[in-house]
């Protein structure tokens, strides 16, 4: 048994998450974690809601809430949505815990002591009405290079050039339309140049990364600059330095603290297990691989910023230094970044109303239909497009007609003719019987290898190929026509049931909810594919502060079945089956498109009204 760390990108708590989000960080990470558990490895899968930074403040002010109140609201919404999606976290927590604050501050202090954090100043954009730092992407104006309108303070989408906010022509705040002021303010910086050589050397040892991820990551080192890790803001983790710790308007930058969440969540998990040092088995053992799952917009933070923070903490940059008491910390084995998913040809955007929220789609459609579509059509190595027509087609043709119908046919034939799993009569077996069983058993290596190398689309297609071949076997053997040879009929149905059971094992990481139903349809008892649970807990360090966590019991041999062919139990009672998957009416496509157009128009009207009110308020002042 090996230890495997699965770190999942932290969803930002300024609103509910949509399908584009979970297509990048959610379902792929869960498929991988479930597979590794079935292989017998000791998996620790962690994440949580990212709750600091300006966007939280902006959204809170829109809704008349404090930042903490808004974070509390969406922490609960997001945790429930991800739990309902079946994401099997060992711990899904949040960044406003006392534990997280302590771990972040300890990281900062050790990096400072080692010389990789220093004090300096930089020109920043300030909101005149609030006095807060405006993030680069909250400023827009005319591009100084191609002169396109709507260029952001970090990049112009029209020409692709990176920008600084003060380079924009006629810059304005996207929040309220005011013109920002630019001024020099004092900040702490992470000395990325002093860590660049070690960071790049580590990257060059990485094997098996997706081509776009490793190429983008190495490209970050063409020109490396120090990065400010504090902000002029009143919402965030206090800077643990004398003269700063009590300053209400200086906080650590949200991205400095968010990536440390993987470590702090692991520590919180261990503390909640009653074994406070157990997290070290995943973080301090150099033989334990750590896999990070995210969308491609987060690559920078996981192949440069977070590794640099760990190198600084470990004292492994050009300035040397001591390893802190939590170290040495393991750098990522692999950054598994997906591309982007669009919706009906448009870029997902919550602010623009181009969105399908997880809660909404799960309220109308089966969870495994959603997981399947994300897995088969998601943005694994290139951008992909969510369309309602394809969602319905994949469900109806592949889940309902092919897989679900197969399970029902086999279970119904067994129930009707035997009432239980019939024995296998070796004397009546044919080469066709043996060939199907051998193919299904051999598929574990093929599908498993693809999941291990993060080619989940190929893995799923291979599993569904087995399903197709079982259907062909049923059609070829025609068990409904075998009337006078019970031994042969029993053998055909035993072979079919064994192959279906094997296919169910292969599909379980992708379809955990229906896997349980298939298991029971073939006479299985107990838990086959465990699901996560929401649990209300009290903060370990802030009495009275409560929040939901996602956790679960995923123990091989107890409620997790192994990644191999398990012999079905002869004599197990097979009940009259109920449908595993239902077809979605084709009319749903037009209904969903109409619902989307209506919601989009309403969102645009509401946003225009809000911005007009903000401008009127500024003018009145």
From Swiss-Prot:
GO terms for molecular function: ATP binding; metal ion binding; methionine-tRNA ligase activity. Gene3D superfamilies: HUPs, Isoleucyl-tRNA Synthetase, Domain 1, Methionyl-tRNA synthetase, Zn-domain. Binds 1 zinc ion per subunit. Zn(2+) binds at residues 143, 146, 156, 159. A motif ('KMSKS' region) lies at residues 347-351. Coiled coil: none annotated. A motif ('HIGH' region) lies at residues 11-21. GO terms for cellular component: cytosol. Pfam families: Anticodon_1, tRNA-synt_1g. It is found in: Cytoplasm. The keyword Protein biosynthesis applies. ATP binds at residue 350. It catalyses: tRNA(Met) + L-methionine + ATP = L-methionyl-tRNA(Met) + AMP + diphosphate. Keywords: Aminoacyl-tRNA synthetase, ATP-binding, Cytoplasm, Ligase, Metal-binding, Nucleotide-binding, Protein biosynthesis, Zinc. Monomer. Is required not only for elongation of protein synthesis but also for the initiation of all mRNA translation through initiator tRNA(fMet) aminoacylation. NCBIfam families: metG. This is Methionine--tRNA ligase. It comes from Bifidobacterium longum subsp. infantis (strain ATCC 15697 / DSM 20088 / JCM 1222 / NCTC 11817 / S12).
């Amino acid at each position: 048994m090996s230890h495997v760390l699965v770190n999942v990108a932290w969803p930002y708590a300024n609103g509910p998450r949509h399908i584009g989000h979970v297509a990048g960080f959610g379902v792929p990470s869960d498929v991988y974690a479930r597979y590794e558990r079935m292989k017998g490895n000791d998996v620790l899968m962690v994440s949580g809601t990212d709750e600091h930074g300006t966007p939280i403040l902006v959204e809170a002010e829109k809704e008349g809430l404090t930042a903490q109140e808004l974070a509390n609201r969406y922490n609960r919404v997001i945790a429930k949505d991800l739990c309902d999606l079946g994401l099997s976290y060992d711990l899904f927590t949040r960044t406003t815990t006392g534990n997280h604050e302590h771990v972040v501050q300890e990281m900062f202090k050790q990096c400072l002591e080692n010389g990789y954090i220093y004090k300096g100043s930089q020109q920043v954009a300030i909101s005149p009405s609030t006095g807060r730092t405006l993030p680069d992407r909250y400023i827009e104006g005319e591009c100084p290079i191609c002169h396109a309108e709507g260029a952001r303070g970090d990049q112009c989408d029209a020409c692709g050039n990176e920008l600084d906010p003060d380079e924009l022509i006629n810059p304005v705040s996207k929040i309220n339309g005011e013109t920002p002021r630019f001024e020099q303010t004092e900040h702490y910086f992470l000395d990325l140049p002093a860590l660049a050589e070690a960071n790049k050397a580590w990257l060059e040892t990485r094997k098996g990364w997706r081509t776009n991820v490793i190429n983008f990551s190495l490209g970050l080192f063409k020109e490396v600059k120090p990065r400010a890790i504090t902000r002029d803001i009143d919402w965030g983790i206090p800077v643990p330095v004398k003269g700063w710790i009590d300053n209400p308007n200086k906080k650590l930058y949200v991205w400095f603290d968010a990536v440390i969440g993987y470590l702090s969540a692991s520590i919180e998990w261990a503390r909640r297990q009653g074994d406070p040092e157990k997290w070290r088995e995943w973080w301090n053992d150099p033989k334990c691989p750590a896999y990070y799952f995210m969308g491609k917009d987060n690559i920078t933070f996981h192949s440069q910023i977070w590794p640099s923070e760990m190198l600084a903490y470990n004292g492994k940059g050009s300035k040397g230094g001591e390893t802190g008491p939590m170290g040495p910390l393991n750098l990522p084995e692999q950054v598994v970044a997906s591309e982007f998913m669009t919706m009906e040809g448009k870029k997902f955007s919550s602010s623009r109303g181009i969105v399908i929220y997880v809660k909404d789609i799960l309220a109308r459609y089966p969870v495994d239909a959603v997981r399947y579509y994300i897995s088969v059509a998601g943005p694994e190595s290139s951008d992909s497009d969510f369309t309602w027509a394809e969602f319905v087609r994949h469900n109806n043709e592949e889940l309902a007609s092919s897989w679900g119908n197969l399970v029902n046919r086999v279970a119904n034939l067994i129930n009707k003719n035997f009432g239980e799993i019939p024995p296998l009569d070796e004397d009546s077996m044919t080469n066709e019987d043996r060939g199907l069983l051998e193919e299904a058993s051999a598929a574990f290596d093929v599908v498993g290898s693809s999941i291990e190398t993060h080619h989940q689309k190929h893995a799923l297609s291979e599993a569904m190929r087995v399903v197709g071949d079982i259907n062909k076997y049923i059609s070829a053997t025609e068990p409904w026509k075998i009337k006078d040879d019970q031994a042969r009929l029993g053998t055909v149905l035993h072979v079919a049931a064994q192959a279906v059971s094997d296919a169910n094992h292969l599909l379980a990481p992708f379809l955990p909810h229906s896997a349980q139903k298939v298991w029971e349809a073939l006479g299985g008892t107990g838990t086959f594919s465990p699901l996560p649970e929401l649990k209300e807990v009290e903060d370990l360090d802030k009495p009275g502060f409560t929040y939901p966590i996602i956790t679960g019991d995923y123990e091989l041999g107890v409620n997790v079945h192994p990644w191999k062919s398990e012999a079905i139990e002869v004599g197990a009672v097979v009940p009259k089956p109920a449908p595993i998957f239902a077809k979605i009416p084709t009319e749903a496509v037009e209904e969903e498109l109409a619902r989307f157009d209506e919601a989009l128009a309403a969102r645009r009207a509401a946003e225009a009204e809000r911005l007009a009110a903000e401008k009127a308020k500024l003018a009145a002042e």
